[in-house]
Amino acid sequence: MAEIRPFVSIRPQRGKAAEIAALPYDVYNREEATKEVERHPQSFLSIDRAETQFPLSVDMYDDKVYERAHDTLWQWVENGTFLTEDKKCYYLYELTMNGRVQTGVAACASIDDYENGIIKKHENTRAEKEVDRIRHVDVCNAQTGPIFLAYRANEGIRRIVEKTKQGEPEYDFTSEDGVRHRVFVIREDADIAAIHEAFAGVDSIYIADGHHRAASAVKVGQKRRKEHPGYTGEEEFNYFLSVLFPDDELMIMDYNRVIRDLNGYSFKGLYREVEKRFDVEEITGAEDTRPKERGTFCMYMEEHWFSCHIRQEDRTPEDPVADLDVSILQNKLLEPVLGIRDPKTDGRIDFVGGIRGMDELVRRCEQDCAVAFAMYPTSIAELFAVADAGLLMPPKSTWFEPKLRSGLFIHEI
């Protein structure tokens, strides 16, 4: 029984949504974020990454950075850049990339559902990243970046979504990366009640992207509960900003690996080790170098591409984590042969999102790496199976596109 609520959104005036909407805060390093804000002063990164308002000599975690985020947010509310909705609503957030459409419900999810396992996680979080967002949410008194949630497709929700999308969108713009964004407001009481009831029948919701934002929102909620011992559960700090998508509309892209050296092996030596563990064939001519099916990955080394097939005896369907292609590559090759024991901390491995294409793997091998591995994308069903088992995905297993924009919905707590 998921508790997914409408909320009073703070959001851009209709004509300002395109210039305000920004990629998630953690997509950029400090230099990139600063350049983006210089190009687009109204970008929501001015709030999400308020260190962009200070010289590099100022620590990005200084108290005054969070205070600037608070001040900028509420100045934009006061000067009319943002409006405050006059009632609790749900919103539809539709993203179209390369002809693929996915439509989510923007709403607030319950921190109790997060803590009792109705909202399921599949990633560990890092304390230092949590602390940053905890302070940002707490000082701003608002959640500014939605958590990307997924649920098993539900016909009742789909009907309301399709009906709503027949009306006029509140926002309709195309971002610089070619993604079209449309937002619809669900204001009718009957539709609001129907969505609330439909989600109440959903027994599991999954964090697709935004584990640190979710953990931070929950911890701020817990802190506020301690500060308000008479809390009722109705206060806004008991809920966190989310956009919920049906699983059958989501696209996970490949998340590829590049290794800086061959750990002492020659080209032929490493090839022999790979051949012992996988069924290998060279890719010749103009063949596509992307893996074509689960159980296959492609390797690039010294201007040669190879297709590598996982053997059936290495499959472990009873263990949803060990059975992932990325786990088998890690456990059969990256650790025992290339010496990558902990991919989270080993500086010899890097990860390349599939949105960058196979050419980026070749470029990295020409520039600063020795071998690249192109993976077949993890499926949403595999992610659900891992989360349902209460397990964690290996690092850098999933790359979701398109990314949700921050700044289109703000939840005051």
Where are the language model's segments positioned?
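Surface-exposed, charge/polar-rich loops and edge strands
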Residues: M1-I413
